[in-house]
């Protein structure tokens, strides 16, 4: 399955997209969490938002 992880700045602008190919949504969530750094990450599958992961403070 194909997913998109969008790196989102605090002002809401997308700064990057990472295409993720995984066997299932659980794996996609795990990989998206690993991408979180200073910016939030939104995990999408097509036009469906799966989850938004916020950076730890």
Where are the model-predicted features located?
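Short aromatic-glycine-(Arg/Gly/Cys) micro-motifs in beta-strand/loop hairpins
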Residues: 1-15
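Short, mixed-charge low-complexity intrinsically disordered segments
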Residues: 37-57
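Short histidine
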Residues: 22-26, 56-57
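A short, exposed loop/beta-hairpin motif centered on an aromatic-Gly-Thr core
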Residues: 15-22
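A short, charged, amphipathic alpha-helix used as a generic interaction element across diverse proteins
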Residues: 24-38
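Residues in well-ordered beta-strands of folded domains
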Residues: 6, 21, 44
């Amino acid at each position: 399955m194909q997913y998109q992880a969008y790196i989102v700045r605090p002002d809401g602008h997308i700064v990057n997209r990472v295409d993720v190919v995984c066997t299932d949504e659980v794996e996609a969530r795990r990989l998206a969490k690993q991408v979180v750094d200073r910016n939030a990450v939104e995990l999408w599958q097509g036009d469906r938002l799966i989850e938004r992961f916020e950076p730890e403070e």
